């Protein structure tokens, strides 16, 4: 049973109820018509994304060729990793609340690089342990350079002034 329950006063409100479950997670109950509409919209967004994908891939390749470790290169490496491994992007709130990680929240300790092989090992969504391997020389070099940047976050970049910054999920 949920605690701290809120129930919509409108019969046709898109959000019908919210509450906190036994594991202290906020849960949402949506109106069935809203769910159907969102699913249909999701399909059309996916079609637009499919049409944009070739250009995205060209931009990723261009950004991977940049010198140094600028933000664009790190984001391109992350997009390439997501495409090749199907890794979720993750976000800091899930890390804080559940101790689970995604690509944007990985730490140096979650990656082992030997030659051209990257081995990711971390607790993912819903506490499922992830073991992901990938052979790619260019990505291995870039991720190794990221790992060498001071700080616990794996994916960081240097700006034009040489200042270090972390990547968050919204940037990806």
Say what each PLM segment does.
Residues 1-101, 107-172:
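A positively charged, amphipathic N-terminal helix/segment that binds anionic biomolecules
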